[in-house]
Amino acid sequence: MFASRFKVCRQILENVWQTKKLTLKQKFLISELQKQKKNKKQSDFSIQLQTIKKLSLFYGNLPIKKMQRAKTHTYIDKKNSLLFNIEKRLDVILVRLNFCSTMFQARQLISHKNICVNYKKVNIPGFQVSNGDLISIQENSLDFFKSNIRKNFQTNRIRRMKPNHLEVNYKTLKAVVLYEPQQIQFPYKIDLDLLD
């Protein structure tokens, strides 16, 4: 794993990159740091900050300020509405549909105007998709996406289960958002109660 990515793993004390594996030396370093940290008492603020960092990394380095700003706009159920607003972003949906393997790849493809929502080109990665919106791929990019999806299925880099709130046709590479997401699965432990 690259040094810059491992630096993040050292701060959070676990591997937050789903596609990258740690070397034996890196695993040993993290386990030693975890042992040292068990002896120290963490403040509530540091635990909350670590949770927000994990969430930010899970969503491809989404700026923490954006997440906190989204949290302050909602009053009823802050943690769920924050996560569901993030889950309705176009870049996140492309990763959930397995059209892209990483958030960074999804953002790049959106900014190059390869994605359409309701047959209109969109170049904003944070575009909020509504229920019933049709997500499609530009004609000139279809071959790239099909080869990317095929490669990801062969290497098992993508999860074969798609979320229930999305309906996708992999032959035409079109998808529809059916309803609001009901449940979000994380590859590592995140205590969402700390987001209140």
Swiss-Prot record:
Keywords: Mitochondrion, Ribonucleoprotein, Ribosomal protein, RNA-binding, rRNA-binding. One of its GO terms (molecular function) is structural constituent of ribosome. GO terms for biological process: translation. The keyword Iron-sulfur does not apply. It is found in: Mitochondrion. InterPro entries: Ribosomal_uS4 (IPR022801), Ribosomal_uS4_bac-type (IPR005709), Ribosomal_uS4_CS (IPR018079), S4_RNA-bd (IPR002942), S4_RNA-bd_sf (IPR036986). One of its GO terms (cellular component) is small ribosomal subunit. Its main location: mitochondrion. Residues 88-154 form the S4 RNA-binding domain. NCBIfam families: rpsD_bact. Belongs to the universal ribosomal protein uS4 family. PANTHER family: 30S 40S RIBOSOMAL PROTEIN, SMALL RIBOSOMAL SUBUNIT PROTEIN US4M. This is Small ribosomal subunit protein uS4m.
